From Swiss-Prot:
GO BP annotations, alphabetical order: proteolysis
Transmembrane segments: 66-86, 92-112, 132-152
Organism: Geobacter metallireducens (strain ATCC 53774 / DSM 7210 / GS-15)
This protein's name: Lipoprotein signal peptidase
Keyword Zinc attributed: no
Length: 162
């Protein structure tokens, strides 16, 4: 197995297992909207359901479920195509795309199974709350940040070589 495919398999599997296990744990142990402070004034575990996308975007759109499923499948295909084009030395890009892919799959599982996504990570400062999110959302954000860093690093390396 090529190194990047090994990375993809491991990162995707680990991220997906953590995402689904935490969602199952929250769903089985908390009531909807129940909140458990972890770091008072900063972070709680709060069981929420999100019918939309980030920040509940399109949560009232009638065809949101098939729309989000279709968009996710297209994104997953684009990630897979991009991944296949990576060189063996592009390990950070491989990790990045794996995280983004696993996050997409994690939220897709929720949408197909429940028609909505389980969110539970609640970050806030006093009365100002960031929208609740989950491990899949975190994987996507970290993956995008790492991919941006990898692109900057590659650009600097190429300009240095020229």
């Amino acid at each position: 197995m090529k190194p990047n495919y090994r990375i993809f398999s491991i990162v995707t599997a680990v991220s997906l297992v953590i995402d689904q296990a935490t969602k199952i744990l929250v769903d089985r142990t908390l009531e909807l909207y129940q909140s458990i402070p972890v770091v008072p004034g900063l972070f709680s575990i709060t069981y929420m359901r999100n019918k939309g996308a980030a920040f509940s975007f399109l949560s009232n759109f009638d065809y949101r479920r098939p729309f989000f499923i279709a968009v996710t499948l297209v994104a997953m295909a684009a990630i897979a195509i991009t991944f296949r084009k990576l060189r063996d030395d592009q390990r950070l890009a491989a990790v990045s795309l794996s995280l983004i892919f696993s996050g997409a799959v994690g939220n897709l599982i929720d949408r197909v199974r429940l028609g909505e996504v389980i969110d539970f990570l609640d970050v806030y400062w006093k009365t100002h709350h960031w929208p609740a999110f989950n491990v899949a959302d975190s994987a996507i954000c970290v993956g995008v940040a790492l991919l941006a860093l990898d692109m900057i690093r590659d650009e600097r390396r190429q300009s240095k070589d020229n």
